[in-house]
Regions:
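N-terminal binding-site loop/beta-alpha segment at the start of enzyme catalytic domains
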Residues: 1-84
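Terminal-tail/helix-coil boundary detector
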Residues: 2, 231-271, 286-290, 300, ...
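Conserved, mostly hydrophobic/aromatic
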Residues: 9, 21, 41, 56, ...
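Short, well-ordered coil/turn segments that N-cap beta-strands
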Residues: 14-19, 52-55, 80-84, 122-126, ...
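Active-site beta-loop-alpha junctions enriched in small/polar residues
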Residues: 24-26, 59-61, 89-93, 130-133, ...
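Generic structural signal for well-ordered alpha-helices
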Residues: 45, 68, 72, 113-117, ...
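Glycine/proline-rich, positively charged
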Residues: 95-200, 211
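Aromatic-lined glycan-binding groove of carbohydrate-active enzymes
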Residues: 197-239, 275
Length: 359
């Protein structure tokens, strides 16, 4: 049986499972392939609990609020609220009639938490993520609101999601300077098709101790092995959500790296007797910077397949092949700060010692 393990969330004493269950599909509001019945949601949560998952990821906008409602109800049905860590989020606009119902202002953060508590049917949220950088609210305002909510006992920990590296650094420094709760974790898109965060956030979390939770580890299903991508015809073939409702802008399925990674995972999976999706997850879990991986599934069988990735120990040569297949262009300024430039600063004989935190 796949063995879930537990890790501390950042520099806190909170223990979370290395696989988190994303419950965006809990609800009936988002249409085909993005919803399930209440009975299916209840059964899926039972599978997760039975296999040791204690970390559940939702948001106030998932399925227009039903995700939180159904998660809270499913936990109550099993009297399991006390044994789990609930992470939810605020930031996206929830009311088209209210211009202040989106963003990370004090007004919206506090109001969003109050509504989430009612939907979840609980007296506290374990981890509140600011769902995204809203582009306007000063970081001090958002963090002060979160600190007050921690003091009031309505949330336990604060996190960030989908923010630039400079914002995360500012938030961590401001919180520490003001004596406010320091962000416990950042939740970011990370997969073999989206490795941008390695340049900014891997060094950031190593330096600060902030936890790192990966979302989108299978790139909206592209890495499950169920799909093929034709770059010339710009066509995706396969039977599943990707071919029917692929609307996310987070992953461009027609980049050259996509079929290259799909082929690499398929080849390694055939050799190892595993599925491509399991290898894609195992590759992420091999990264010491990653605290937990949030997976979204539509049924218990899919969750069990994902959990089987915990039994996979990829040898160095397989990790290297996936690294090579998924290699993506290095952004500036890291292209400028490469070894040839660093050698001009430190001298070639001192280069290794001078760059202990190179991403």
């Amino acid at each position: 049986m796949s063995k879930v393990t537990y890790r501390l969330l950042g520099r806190t004493g909170l223990k979370v499972s290395n696989i988190a269950l994303g419950v965006a599909t809990f609800g009936s509001q988002w249409g085909p392939r993005w919803t399930m019945s209440a009975a299916e949601a209840d059964a899926l949560l039972g599978v997760a609990l039975d296999h040791g998952i204690n970390f559940f990821d939702t948001a106030n906008v998932y399925n227009r609020g039903e995700s939180e409602t159904w998660l809270g109800r499913a936990l109550r049905n099993r009297s399991a609220r006390h044994q789990v860590v609930i992470a939810t989020k605020c930031g996206y606009r929830t009311d088209p009639r209210d211009v202040n119902s989106g963003g990370c202002s004090r007004r919206n953060v506090v109001a969003s938490v109050e509504r989430s508590l009612r939907r979840l049917g609980t007296d506290h949220i374990d981890l509140l993520y600011l769902h995204l950088w809203d582009g306007v609210t000063p970081v001090e305002e958002s963090l002060a609101a979160a600190a007050d909510l921690v003091s009031a006992g309505k949330i336990r920990y604060v996190g960030l999601s989908n923010v630039p590296g400079w914002y995360a650094g500012q938030a961590e420094a401001v919180a520490r300077w003001r004596g406010w709760p320091v962000p416990a974790a950042v939740q970011l898109n990370y997969s073999a098709l989206e490795r941008t965060i390695e340049h900014e956030f891997f060094p950031f979390t190593a330096a600060t101790g902030v936890g790192l939770v990966a979302w989108g580890p299978l790139a909206n299903g592209l890495l499950t092995g169920r799909y093929r991508v034709d770059l010339e015809e710009r066509r995706i073939t396969g039977d599943g959500r990707v071919t029917q409702t692929f609307t996310t802008g987070d992953v461009d399925p027609f980049r050259p790296v996509v079929p290259r990674v799909i082929a690499c995972l398929a080849d390694l999976a055939a050799r190892r007797g595993r599925t491509p999706g399991q290898l894609a997850l195992a590759w992420i879990l091999s990264k010491p910077e990653i605290t937990s991986v949030a997976v979204g599934v539509s049924c218990g069988d899919q969750l069990l397949e994902n959990l089987a990735a915990l039994d996979v120990s990829l040898p160095p040569e397989d990790l290297a092949r996936i690294d090579e297949a998924s290699a993506q262009p290095t952004p500036y300024p890291y292209t400028f700060l490469a070894d040839d430039i660093q050698a001009l600063v430190h001298g070639p004989e001192q280069l290794r010692a001078a760059r202990p935190m190179t991403p």
